[in-house]
Amino acid sequence: IHSLNDYANNDNNGRGNNTNNQNNQFFLAQMNPENSEGNSFFEQLFPKSIYHMKTLSYLIICILSGIYIIQLIAYYAFYRPNGYSWGCLLYHFGASEISSVANHYQYHRLITPILTHNTFGHLFSNVLSIAFIGFYVEYDLKNYTNYLLLFIISGIIGNFCSLLFSYQNISMGASGAILGLCGYYILYFILNWDKMNYNQKCCSILFFTIIFMNLISGISVGSSTVDIHSHIGGLMGGLAFSFILFYRNQLFYRFNQNYAKLIYYGSIGFLVGLPIISILVINLKEIPNNCEFICLSEKA
């Protein structure tokens, strides 16, 4: 997720209720000791059985790539010849901007930023993350609806956090939604750690390292280029929604029933409460209409 400061250069271009022991295979099924003896570490990390075109992950990758191509065509065909910046194009394509949400009630900007990217490198890193993580999560959930909800809800929660804590910039990108998928991963591995063999634990540590590096990237490169609040919000949203998906199976058996209910209702409260609090806070603040200055033509 990037902020408006990146655009000074115009040329810058769930698990559902059916998740019982039979469905709870995902990584463990692909890498159990019986099946993993003849496979290399790479083959266990990228099993061929989960990578195919009939998945939402593949569709999401195609949609994100297609929208970025449309952005480039629109920029070089209309925006640049008429003196409009790349940031103006991103704003018109639905990037998140607080005054548009607070003063003009454009709440679609809580969803559309997930589909918009700043640069090819920005898009490539997110597509690579979906290829590395999304297919696994989708395979484990075995439910298109839960997977799509996990992806979208995480992205929305991330955008709410961005508005709440980084309200002077615009932002966009699927990073928050992807960190939500990582949140599912974290909970899954915690609940299944004692069932994993050595290779499985090595892979899980690799995934955790990627998640950690994704989070600290916002700090290391500075808040002017990466919206760390959206990353953290997406991760928290993914964890909360994953708690809800896991509630009727693993959480119920791993924890005291009262603790499981507390986590379950706390997760619901977080997913419902954060958007409400965010909307109240940004509407109580006097926020200038910065959106009026984003698309001023240099030829004017």
Over which residues does each language-model region extend?
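C-terminal transmembrane module of polytopic alpha-helical membrane proteins
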Residues: 1-56, 63, 213-300
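Short, motif-level signal for alpha-helix interfacial/capping segments enriched in acidic residues
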Residues: 41-43, 49, 94-104, 154-156, ...
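N-terminal TM1-TM2 helical hairpin plus the immediately adjacent luminal interfacial "cap"
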Residues: 52-174, 221-226
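Perimembrane helix-loop junctions in membrane proteins
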Residues: 71, 75-82, 192-196, 249, ...
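Alpha-helical transmembrane bundle and helix-membrane interface signal
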Residues: 138-145, 185-204, 246-255
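Cytoplasmic-side transmembrane-helix entry/capping segments in multi-pass membrane proteins
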Residues: 148-150, 173-178, 199-205
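Specific transmembrane alpha-helix
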Residues: 157-161, 169-192, 232-246
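Conserved, structured regulatory domains from eukaryotic proteins
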Residues: 158, 184-224
